[in-house]
Amino acid sequence: MFHLYLLLVFETRYTCLMKCSISTCSYRWLRRREWFCLIYSGCCRKILVIEGLQRSDVAFLFTRRTIMHYVPFRGLFCASCVGYFSIRCCSRCEHFCTKTPTKSFGTEAWS
């Protein structure tokens, strides 16, 4: 039973990442352990940032796990690609995860 649980958790995370890899956004993939799902949008991305925010704002929003409480979400956003918040804009996020993490920003703990 325990092994089955581990398999289900792995499969959920893998499916989530694969769905994002075929999304309309195009940017280089980094280490998988740095990816997570936003709680409110359910969208898999590495460091999601809204255009115009400062680095400190992004860090604050993600540590609080309430980015949608602070930033209006209309389906348009920018995703960080390589380096320290270098921004590439995406048109939409059309693929979603089935689960959300228990913690945000660089964890693999799934609820």
Curated annotation (Swiss-Prot):
Domain of life per record: Eukaryota
Transmembrane segment boundaries: none
Localization per Swiss-Prot or TrEMBL: Secreted; Host nucleus
Signal sequence coordinates: 1-17
Keywords for this protein: Host nucleus, Secreted, Signal, Virulence
Motif range (RxLR): 28-31
Any one of the GO CC terms: host cell nucleus
UniProt remark on domains: Has the canonical translocation RxLR motif, but lacks the canonical EER motif, which characterizes most oomycete effectors identified so far.
Similarity comment: Belongs to the RxLR effector family.
Entry function: Secreted effector that acts as an elicitor that induces cell death in host plant cells.
Name of the protein in question: Secreted RxLR effector protein 82
Source organism of the structure: Plasmopara viticola
